[in-house]
Amino acid sequence: ESAVNYRLSFKANSPLVSQDGYIVYNLPETEQGIKSWEMSRLNTDRKSTLEIPYLITETYDYLLSIEPGIEFKSNPVEIKKQNKIGSVNIRIRQINNTIQVHKEIQLSKNTITPAEYGDFRALLTEWQNPLGQKLIFKKNDINK
């Protein structure tokens, strides 16, 4: 087997959704990664072996600059989980006017037994946690 590496770079001016005075930014992710496996809903237990398509390390690093008048409203996130199936690391923090986001999941087994399924599910549940997928901002009224 050979590894495939993708490097994605983009610049976006306004992929934002405004809701009730708040701005929601959905962090982009590749359609070729775990998202392509369509495993957004996982049962709590499993009676048969699960085969995932391939071993994967999926990593995203984002740096977002905030303009004056925009306030970052999301809480900082620090998620670290490791088990015999792999690991998940998600960190979101603000440093001055920059938001730093790091997301990484690594799966080291592609055949998951029913006994291991709970560990697999725990990793995917953290990876799909909405806290690590959306950033919330509020535009301040500077005319007050």
Regions found by a protein language model. Name each.
Residues 1-144:
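A sensor for short, sequence-defined functional sites
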